[in-house]
């Protein structure tokens, strides 16, 4: 049962205004507190009130995160909650919505089911990138290119920390299953 949910939306408030209103109504009915970062609350002209908490940034101690937008918005939420165990529930307000859980039809019923915990979660694989400056994780893909002015890059790649190959090239794209169609389609 969900008691606290974070909310992240598309950068244009008008795209998700109706959905935010619906989410607030269903959340109040279910006794769920919605948590918004200050800039998100300002974007939607919301203030801390009954059922709404506003903080400088999103807390990680929530039960669920709603991401209302396109895949970019959903990726932002997934990055924020990576490694926390907080599931991200995506509502598609973008062009493709590959990462979205639902489309914006019948939101009240879908939000109510989400608050009741009536959803399955899936874990998405990530790619870990290691550099001397630190490590990063990528949910979709990693693109490595040669330095400007150099003819080719000499790249090594590893699986589970063990080097499995080297390649001399202009660049290399490594994609997870959920993003594997992006690089080829970008060439069309």
Residue ranges of each PLM-predicted region?
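Short, solvent-exposed amphipathic alpha-helical segments in soluble enzyme
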Residues: 21-26, 82-83, 188
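AMP-binding/adenylate-forming core of the ANL superfamily
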Residues: 171-175
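Short, ordered loop/turn segments at secondary-structure junctions
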Residues: 39-41, 71, 93-94
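Short glycine/serine/threonine-rich phosphate/pyrophosphate-binding segments
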Residues: 16-17, 72-78, 180-186
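Catalytic core of DAGKc-family lipid kinases
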Residues: 94-170
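ATP/NTP phosphate-donor binding region
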Residues: 1-64, 76, 105-120, 131-136
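Gly/Ser-rich helix-loop-strand patches that form or flank binding pockets
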Residues: 81-91
